[in-house]
Amino acid sequence: QMCIRDRNNPWFMILTLIGSFGSLGLVYWKRHNHPTNLYMLGLFTSVESVALGTLVSFLDQTIVLKAIIVTAFIFLGLTLFTLQSKYDFSHMGTWLYWSLLILVGTGLVQMFFPYNHLFELAYSIVGCFVFSGYVIYDTWLLQRRLSPDDWVLANVSLYLDIVNLFVSILRLMNGSSDE
């Protein structure tokens, strides 16, 4: 069998993780070289879709569908709010950056400890807030600060915001259904 079909193969997840970071680096490196930037964006999107597809293959279909719908409504609402808002969201960048670092660090530390349902719940809720903040911040950057030449980076930023918000909502819904 191919390793893609074997969901329990840890090497597959490691390869998709390496592929995600590698293709993200290539997108950043070639962001101003047209049409190479399109190929790199396609590669990044493909690798991310394989990783996300593998993740959702472990979960109940109804939970995945609910998470997709909730993510879509949250993203649409936050985007519309940001586009019509007169607020300056530039101050959010530093807070979001440090929140993300704390979230990643906490997740890495948690890998070495036994599963804790309350920690998973809190981690998912914080993730939802952080990535909702990133949707607002990156939409504001796209609208007010980024030049038209930076559309590839803006695309990747919003894509990662949506994917990470979806994964946080998915973790939250999956954790609440396990009770």
Model-derived features with residue positions:
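A hydrophobic alpha-helical transmembrane-helix feature that marks the membrane cores
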Residues: 1, 5-179
